[in-house]
Amino acid sequence: MEIQFLGTGAGQPSKSRNTQAIALKMLDERNEIWLFDCGEASQHQILNTAIKPRKITKIFITHLHGDHIFGLPGFLSSRSFQSSDEQTDLDLYGPVGIKEFVLTGLRISGSRLGYRINFHEIDSAGKIFEDDSFEVYTDLLDHTIFCLGYRVVEKNRVGELDANALKEAGLPFGPLFGKIKKGEVVAYDGKTFDPKDYIGADKVGKIVTILGDTRKTKTAVRLAWQADLLVHEATYEASESKMARAHGHSTTKQAADVAKEAGVNRLLLTHISARYVGPLVGQLVREAQAVHANTFVSKDLYEEKIG
């Protein structure tokens, strides 16, 4: 898995930071990309990346403030134009009201999509998605309006099959290898091949937590518990805690406190106020790293491998 930031600014676009959008690239795991928030000009930012819109199969909206949703109608329309003839449906998760916002924009603009949007409006905490390889949980944060955080959990995967050991034990390469990989005991040529003798330890899945706008809250700690990566907003520097609370946001130190309390490995900060440019960004980094060393202040188009 990889994460890429399409927008890292707060409130409105600036010369150096676009509004909020984050791509969680799961190409090796499921040949998909999941998008978290879709602020103004997100589709333009995508043009500066290797992301293909048709690969985006799920969008998770944290809340309905404009800097997190104003890019949705344009992106959804362009996805029709840029995709192949066989267009894939898209799942859209978010607070109650996201369906009305999207459908109203598409209707008034006369836009017609070549694919179906499956809307999943959320009004409470819990598990919102599960398949054979991933689970997604959500919970309510502490912002000025209803706002969500998301916890993406990759399930453990079966360990590597020791093909050389099987061959040396007398099992010819073929379909029986697949049965052993699935956990089946195989009998061949008078011998029994037990999967536990030829499959390594399970590969532990990654945990990624992406939060919307929020004051410091215990909910954030729960969502981020033992995560490999936490994406947390840090709109203000540490000395502006009163300002942050008044506007429903967090400081660098508060975000780092959450990461430390939750036992997070890596913390990436986003939703940075436009007042912080140049050397001031370094100040934000130092404030957070004083609490949680493995921290970085994200910038637009920044990308890194998870774990």
Swiss-Prot record:
Keywords: Endonuclease, Hydrolase, Metal-binding, Nuclease, tRNA processing, Zinc. Binds 2 Zn(2+) ions. The active site is at D67 (proton acceptor). It catalyses: Endonucleolytic cleavage of RNA, removing extra 3' nucleotides from tRNA precursor, generating 3' termini of tRNAs. A 3'-hydroxy group is left at the tRNA terminus and a 5'-phosphoryl group is left at the trailer molecule. InterPro entries: Metallo-B-lactamas (IPR001279), RibonucZ/Hydroxyglut_hydro (IPR036866), RNase_Z/BN (IPR013471). It is an enzyme of class 3 (hydrolase). Zn(2+) 2 binds at D67, H68, D213, H271. GO terms for molecular function: 3'-tRNA processing endoribonuclease activity; zinc ion binding. Pfam families: Lactamase_B, Lactamase_B_2. Its EC number is 3.1.26.11. Zn(2+) 1 binds at H63, H65, H143, D213. Its cofactor is Zn(2+). HAMAP family: RNase_Z_BN. Homodimer. Zinc phosphodiesterase, which displays some tRNA 3'-processing endonuclease activity. Probably involved in tRNA maturation, by removing a 3'-trailer from precursor tRNA. Belongs to the RNase Z family. This is Ribonuclease Z. The gene is rnz.
